[in-house]
A protein has these predicted regions:
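Conserved phosphate-binding loops in N-terminal lobes of ATP-dependent enzymes
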Residues: 47-154
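N-terminal secretory signal peptides that target proteins for export/translocation
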Residues: 1-16
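Glycine-rich beta-strand-to-loop/alpha-helix junction loops that act as flexible
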Residues: 129-135, 194-199, 279-286
Length: 398
């Protein structure tokens, strides 16, 4: 990817999903959970069950393990393990899938499955396996059969609307404190996910009716253009063997015009997307931007600003190495510095310089079109797990 020694690693129609309040309340508790690595524990007076979830997307394999303690009152859910195994499962610059794509995916899923069963003792019947909608729309022909032969698991793809709904519930905190007062955060926030092959967004609205019980509307947007697919589009436009300078000039000249137009068309039917007070960013691009800008910030929600996004777009276009290969000795804590260095290495293995440049332009265009100048913007570090977390949680409480 970068020249350093590293390890390799049609627009949708407007859609609104209306859910009964009872179903949505099950989703509302998700963000109170903390995912990480921990040993299962058995609280006094309770029985414990273990569940696992695996999600396959163009960006990789996301895996979680949950411990459910059945008490007299209600189930208590605790995250005991989470991991992101990054892969490149999308089409390459020539429009074809890498020949080893299905094999790599099956190996990663097999690794996740083994870890859930052997290390965390999750029974096979309590492990749920889903595929992201973008991968479902465009994937290698043999992907499902190769995974099934290697793991015994059947891949069930989500549709885009359901995926966005689950991601919103699993990523955006239910409440938010403003001047010491708790407010309904999901009714004033939006989720934006920049994927490799698509860009998704969504938000929640509580609607009241004099004829029926309250219901939530999950408004979803999905544009079939992501960081890698846009970079491939630019590469084809400038021609094979073109220089990084030519690529960057094309990105800046076109300013992601096709993506901008698709976004504007979506906003015609979803104008409220511009009026959310807070924005939560997820996906590999958001992770790379937040890490390269603020490597020392390791909290769950990393704040970034509109100006950060504008400046990142210019800096990464001017010299990708300036950010991706920066000196990290200013981080005094050695353990933290090592963790950050591993993240930087992972970023360089995940993205080519051209892809970071293209992705930064897409992020800039989104910030401009959605008018983020006065918004609160956050990179949601655990947002990549939001969908599979919500999906597994709903299976548990059924």
């Amino acid at each position: 990817m970068f020249s350093s020694k590293i390890r390799s690693g049609a627009e949708c129609a407007p859609k609104v999903l209306t859910l009964p309040l009872s179903v949505c309340l099950l989703l509302c508790v998700l963000c109170a959970m903390t995912l990480g690595q921990a040993s299962p524990s058995n609280p006094p007076g309770s029985s414990v069950e273990l569940y696992g979830g695996i999600e396959l997307s163009n960006e990789g394999v996301k895996v979680i393990a949950l411990q459910v303690s059945q008490t007299d009152d209600e189930p208590s859910i605790k995250g005991i393990y989470s991991e992101m195994i990054r892969l490149r499962l999308g089409r390459a610059n020539d429009g074809e899938f890498p020949p080893q794509a299905s094999t790599d995916a099956a190996q990663a899923v097999s690794t996740a499955l083994s870890r859930l069963q052997q290390q965390y003792k999750v029974p096979p019947e309590r492990i749920y396996f889903i595929g992201a909608s973008g991968l479902g729309a465009d994937h290698p022909k043999d992907l499902e059969s190769v995974i099934r032969d290697a793991t015994g698991l059947t891949l069930n793809f989500l549709d885009a609307v359901t995926e966005v709904q689950l991601s919103v519930a699993g990523t955006i905190p239910r409440t938010w404190k403003v001047a010491g007062v708790s407010t309904d955060n999901r009714n004033t926030s939006a989720l934006i996910h920049f994927g490799n092959a698509s860009t998704q967004a969504g938000y929640e609205m509580l609607k009241y009716s004099s004829f029926d019980s309250p219901a939530f509307d999950f408004v979803a947007m999905s544009i079939p253009q992501g960081v890698i697919s846009y970079a491939n589009e630019v590469s084809r436009a400038v021609g094979a063997g073109s220089t990084l300078f030519s690529f960057t000039r094309q990105v800046k000249t076109s300013s992601a015009s096709s993506f901008r137009q698709a976004l504007r068309k979506e906003l015609e039917s979803k104008p409220n997307l511009m009026h959310r007070k807070r924005v939560f960013l997820t996906g590999n691009l958001a992770w790379a931007v937040a890490t390269l800008l603020y490597p020392q910030y390791r909290q769950t929600l990393v704040p970034i600003t509109y100006d950060d996004i504008m400046q990142f777009s210019e800096r990464i276009a001017r010299d990708p190495k300036e950010l991706a290969l920066r000196n990290l000795t200013f981080i005094r804590d050695r353990k933290l510095r090592k963790e950050v260095e591993q993240d930087f290495e992972a970023i360089r293995a995940t993205f080519k310089p051209q892809e970071l440049i293209a992705g930064a332009e897409m992020l800039k265009v989104t910030a401009e079109e959605l008018k983020w100048q006065n918004k609160e913007i956050f990179f949601a570090r655990l947002g990549q797990l939001g969908c599979i977390l919500s999906y597994t949680r709903l299976k548990i409480v059924k």
